[in-house]
Regions:
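FAD/FMN-dependent oxidoreductases across multiple families
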Residues: 237-331
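Glycine-rich FAD pyrophosphate-binding loop
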Residues: 14, 28-50
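A conserved beta-strand/loop capping segment in the N-terminal third of enzymes
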Residues: 63-114
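C-terminal helical "tail/cap" subdomain of flavin- and related membrane-associated enzymes
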Residues: 320-453
Length: 453
């Protein structure tokens, strides 16, 4: 076999999870020679802290990748959803005689990551190099022309027209390229646990918007459901004092929530106390960023996996020809940057604002209340929540007028905030709730631990 330093590549991709593997497949199918680097050697390596939710915006990418049959064979669950609000449940349904609602899948990363990585490894034109990581970039005349790569046999230099950072929210490639990171505080924290055989009405995803707290229960493959609580940080002292008890109390208090006492909890309670949102310019001369490396959303919305797949597809469409030397790479990267910003910038802007830990604003109250009262508005909400339409289309004048008409038809006393646990007061933040006698005894993570992949 040719020594690694003597191999010729058009593109070097750092990171072989969802974004990196998808980009490698899509680029190679367009004639690009790809080195796909993964720092971990374990073929089963996967991201731990994740919603495991593929938004419907990801379905066209999964279809192009040819992964739909493999996902369904692996037990992926089609992700229908309903959302609880102070006005009742939003339950999107297909229009009479209309097409079914767009969907994608819920599937655990322990299943998805090895599946898509294996698919990439079998794709002609892709060299999957596990146990290898980028330790620096090669630069000439102000542009990146390759990467320094560390592996089991030492460090080598790989020259390439394009280096792609698919290496997560703390992206070393972005740091080596000097790409600025914009960081936005998140005034909520989150904890997750996985349950087997958890009863859920209709077996579909449930989300609770409790203003400002949020929670969700998402069924996945192999009969496993992830239950997440995402409270405002004023509840943090109670979780620090007694994670097990606070998590359990929070879930039990959810209106129409899952009966976790009737299920088997199969994991520890894991999560993060501080998960800021990040945005970066997704390209520089000779460098592109995809997935969380370009934009880290709020886990509250479950958008990371879908955006990873979309950004991989946009990159391949924009740069494949230029990456093989048959076009202007700078122009191609500019086209990718514009597509990325046009597709995700508006969604991220709204997510940054909602991450302030606030209740719904007037526009959100208008649209959520109308969606809870009207099937057509619920379908409109579904398209937006699926990231199939952007904020401008979601809040277009016609939609706002329709929502107003719906709400005028349901005039009555102003809806109170959602009933849940009372907000903490200074007298109650020092101690947490007592554990319920039926609470499982599996250990929980340290309350100060932030898990990383």
């Amino acid at each position: 076999m040719t020594a690694l330093e003597d191999r010729v590549y058009d593109v070097v991709i750092s990171g072989a999870s969802i974004a990196g593997s998808a980009a490698a497949i899509l680029l190679a199918r367009r004639g690009v020679r790809v080195a796909l680097l993964e720092r971990r050697s374990d073929p089963a390596a996967h991201k731990v802290l994740c919603t495991h939710y593929l938004q419907p915006c990801s379905y066209p990418v999964l279809e192009e990748l040819g992964l739909i049959p493999a996902l369904e064979a692996a037990g992926a669950v089609r992700n229908e959803a309903r959302w609880y609000t102070r006005w009742g449940w939003i339950e999107p349904k297909a229009a009479p005689s209309g097409p079914e609602l767009p969907y994608s899948y819920n599937i655990r990363r322990s299943t998805l990551d090895p599946l898509i990585r294996s698919h990439a490894a079998k794709t002609p034109g892709v060299d999957l190099l596990t146990g290898h990581s980028v330790t620096g970039l090669l630069q000439e005349a102000g542009r990146t022309v390759g990467a320094r790569v560390s592996g089991p046999d030492g460090e080598v230099e790989l020259r390439a027209r394009l280096v792609v950072g698919a290496d997560g929210k703390d992206s070393p490639v972005a740091r080596f390229a000097g790409i600025e990171t914009r960081t936005y505080d998140n005034e909520r924290f989150s904890y997750f646990a996985h349950f087997r055989n958890l009863p859920l009405r209709d077996g579909i995803t449930h989300s609770w918007f409790l203003e400002p707290d949020v929670a969700y229960a998402m069924p996945n493959d192999d009969g496993v459901t992830v239950v997440a609580v995402i409270p405002g940080k004023d509840r943090l002292p109670a979780f620090r004092a007694n994670l097990e008890g606070a998590y359990t109390e929070f879930v039990r208090a959810l209106p129409g929530g899952p009966d976790i006492d009737a299920a088997e909890r199969i994991t520890k309670i894991t999560g993060t106390l501080n998960y800021p949102l990040h945005s970066r310019r997704p390209g520089a001369p000779g460098v592109a960023l995809i997935g969380d490396a370009a934009l880290t959303g709020d886990p509250l919305w479950g958008v990371g996996c879908g955006w990873a797949l979309q950004s991989a597809q946009w990159l391949a469409e924009a740069t494949a020809t230029a990456a093989t030397g048959r076009g202007d790479l700078d122009q191609a990267l500019t086209a990718y940057i514009r597509r990325h910003r046009r597709g995700l910038g508006g969604h991220q802007h709204l997510a940054v604002d909602y991450a302030k830990g606030r209740p719904f604003n007037p526009f959100e109250r208008l649209m959520f209340s109308a969606a809870a009262r009207d099937e057509a508005m619920a379908r409109h909400m579904h398209l937006f929540a699926s990231r199939l339409i952007g904020p401008l289309r979601f809040l277009n004048p016609v939609a706002l007028a329709q929502a107003s008409v719906v709400n005028l038809r349901h005039r009555g006393p102003r809806a109170a905030p959602p009933a849940h646990l009372p907000r903490p007061t200074p007298a109650t933040t020092a101690t947490g709730p007592a554990p319920h006698p039926r609470t499982a005894t599996l250990p929980a993570t340290s309350q100060n631990e932030r898990l990383t992949p």
